[in-house]
């Protein structure tokens, strides 16, 4: 018997939607604008709870910490979460030993997980190739928040500093069970010399390997790594011809920055045994060694034993979990909102089953009477699904419906990992996290949808959820080369220039169309057309020039507006200086977290 709350799919959206009075903070409003028409108090409360600026986030977290210190048990970790944190230590320790990033700060943070009053701040992402800035900015945001809260707590309680102000841990969860398709194997750099205005660094995968989990994907071959280096050095050389940064000092600055970064790449490559670890180790090298952060890294695929009790809870309460997701998806669809969450998510179990081929399967939950040693065992819970890659039929018995005793077996647990929405549910329930930073893309939508499930399952959401959607504005070698191509000096001039070209193209079209009609009329009537052909030729030639400029300017726009990978920051700022500028923006500004960050490269230019 298939277990599910309902066989009815989410309702289709109507043609129109309404808008209510949901008003999240001004700077963040655009991020959540499509949710404004959702008349749901849970969603409204969640969105309005997200701080607009960093100082507000610090004050709110300080309030949480002070109240926690003043009370005894309510906010402290209970026995379950403390036991789970102890389990977590083993897997964190394993990662940092293998990555060679077991610094003193990391070691001290691991030890803090033994203290029930320790608060955990969490950020999450896949181990992308040369991860883009947004991934690192999550870590910087939480580290800066941690530092500021600890500093203010120290000022308030000098006499109890060791008891109260140094008990925050930053945890970065590596979602290493994602497939090898899409962004996880792609890194971008701005380059108008390429067709789309960007250079793509890409891990080649075959059809047979694109459905592998990143954790099971072998490390790239030396040939691939060398090719990435060759692509980057070629990009550096071609972009260094710009008049704005072709001086010997700039070329030396760029080259030195790149070589320092590539040393970290080579070190991570030498330690890694999988594609996921190569990218994860590089992130940890940057964060823990170069930046000196005490952020803890851990692999999602290894920590299922930490979530054992949570898996049991979600599976035992699957009808509530499923119904919450179904209702949430139906509600958003009625308002014309596509959250990116699969419409069939509510039908699937909250876990993936891992396949021997290295891929995984979405599974459904079945209840079945089974006999064992001629003694009937009532109501066994079975997970069943088909591997996305090899199409094998996977089955796992979790044991008696009321006890799910096989979830206590680590061999069973290591064959599963949580799906997207359950990840945050489990982090909150089983580890008692206090703060979570979301991305601005799919993770934010998943969190909004998940807020409904939190309520239905009586799980407390993080006390504070943050988003840092700001864009970095700077004039690096790729951006300057792009602007120089269209003889512009400011990135803000690109869109007005593009619109002016489109307007000219439309004007030419307006002049050409009647001439074409007149030419056709004259041909039909046998009248001379030489003059019209001459005029048409001149106009079309001018229009072709405009359209060539439009094509070039579109590449320029892509180059200056894209979110490049960490290589662009390493080259233009140096890895260490990158986080300094991000932190400075947070600490020096009371502007919205959505406000752009004006960053200064080390290049000697007119900018």
Language-model features: where?
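N-terminal targeting/trafficking signals and adjacent low-complexity tails
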Residues: 2-607
């Amino acid at each position: 018997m298939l277990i599910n709350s309902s066989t009815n799919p989410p309702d289709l959206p109507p043609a129109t939607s309404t808008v209510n009075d949901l008003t999240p903070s001004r700077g963040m409003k655009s991020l959540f604008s499509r949710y404004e028409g959702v008349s749901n108090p849970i969603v409204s409360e969640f969105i309005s709870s997200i701080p607009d600026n960093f100082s507000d986030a610090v004050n709110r977290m300080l309030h949480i910490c002070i109240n926690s210190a003043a009370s005894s048990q309510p906010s402290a970790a209970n026995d379950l979460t403390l036991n789970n944190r102890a389990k977590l230590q083993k897997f964190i320790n394993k990662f940092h030993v293998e990555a060679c990033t077991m610094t003193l700060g990391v070691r001290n943070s691991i030890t803090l997980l033994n203290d029930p009053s320790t608060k955990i701040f969490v950020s999450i992402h896949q181990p992308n190739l040369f991860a883009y800035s947004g991934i690192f900015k999550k870590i910087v945001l939480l580290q800066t928040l941690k530092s500021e809260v600890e500093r203010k707590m120290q000022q308030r309680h000098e006499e109890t500093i060791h008891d109260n102000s140094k008990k925050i841990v930053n945890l970065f969860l590596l979602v290493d069970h994602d497939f090898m398709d899409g962004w996880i194997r792609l890194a971008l750099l701005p380059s108008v010399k390429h067709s789309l205005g960007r250079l793509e660094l890409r891990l080649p995968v075959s059809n047979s390997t694109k459905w592998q989990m990143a954790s099971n994907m072998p490390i790239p071959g030396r040939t691939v790594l060398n090719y990435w280096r060759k692509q980057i050095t070629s990009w550096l050389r071609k972009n260094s011809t710009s008049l704005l940064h072709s001086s010997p000092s700039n070329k030396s600055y760029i080259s030195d920055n790149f070589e320092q970064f590539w040393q970290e790449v080579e070190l991570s490559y030498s330690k890694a045994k999988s594609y996921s670890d190569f990218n994860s180790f590089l992130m940890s090298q940057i964060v823990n060694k170069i930046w000196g952060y005490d952020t803890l890294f851990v692999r999602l695929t290894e920590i299922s034993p930490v979530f054992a009790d949570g898996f049991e809870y979600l599976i035992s309460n699957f009808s509530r979990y499923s119904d919450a997701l179904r209702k949430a998806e139906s509600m958003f669809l009625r308002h014309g909102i596509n959250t990116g969450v699969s419409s069939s998510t509510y039908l699937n179990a909250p876990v993936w089953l891992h396949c021997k081929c290295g891929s995984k399967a979405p599974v459904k939950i079945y209840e079945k009477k089974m006999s064992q040693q001629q003694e009937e065992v009532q109501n066994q819970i079975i997970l069943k699904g088909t591997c996305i890659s090899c199409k094998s039929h996977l089955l796992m018995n979790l044991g008696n419906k009321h006890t799910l005793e096989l979830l206590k077996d680590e061999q069973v647990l290591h064959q599963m990992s949580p799906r997207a929405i359950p990840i945050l549910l489990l982090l909150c329930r089983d580890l008692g996290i206090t703060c979570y930073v979301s991305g601005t893309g799919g993770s934010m939508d998943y969190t909004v949808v998940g807020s409904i499930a939190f309520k239905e399952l009586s799980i407390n959401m993080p006390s504070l959820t943050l988003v840092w959607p700001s864009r970095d504005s700077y004039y690096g070698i790729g951006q300057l080369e792009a602007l120089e191509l269209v003889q512009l000096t400011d990135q803000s001039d690109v869109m007005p220039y593009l619109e002016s070209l489109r307007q000219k193209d439309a004007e030419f079209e307006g002049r050409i169309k009647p001439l074409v009609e007149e030419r056709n009329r004259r041909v039909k009537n046998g009248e001379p057309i030489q003059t019209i052909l001459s005029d048409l030729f001149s106009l079309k030639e001018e229009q072709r020039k405009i359209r060539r400029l439009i094509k070039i300017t579109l590449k320029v726009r892509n180059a200056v507006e894209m979110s490049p990978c960490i290589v662009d920051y390493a080259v233009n700022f140096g890895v260490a200086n990158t986080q300094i500028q991000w932190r400075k923006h947070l600490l020096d500004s009371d502007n919205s977290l959505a406000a752009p960050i004006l960053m200064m490269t080390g290049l000697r230019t007119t900018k």
